[in-house]
């Protein structure tokens, strides 16, 4: 997947992170490094290929913008 493809399929992009609603979870992709991904489910990061700091950051961005994902 290219950065453009990830951005196009995203429901919301916040600070370079693409948030895509899937069935029962939110997929997060760092558009600057497509290998960095996370899964948010029930308000928690449940899977991640990001650092702990990035996990905290994408979760904060999610909580501030989740109304746009509903």
Predicted features along the sequence, with ranges:
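A short, structured beta-strand/loop element
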Residues: 14-53
């Amino acid at each position: 997947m290219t950065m453009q493809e990830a951005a196009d399929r995203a429901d919301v992009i916040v600070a370079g992170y693409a948030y895509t609603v899937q069935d029962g979870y939110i997929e997060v992709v760092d558009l600057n490094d497509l290998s960095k991904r996370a899964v948010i489910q029930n308000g928690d990061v449940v899977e991640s290929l990001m650092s702990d700091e990035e996990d905290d950051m994408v979760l904060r961005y999610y909580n501030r913008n989740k109304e746009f994902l509903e």
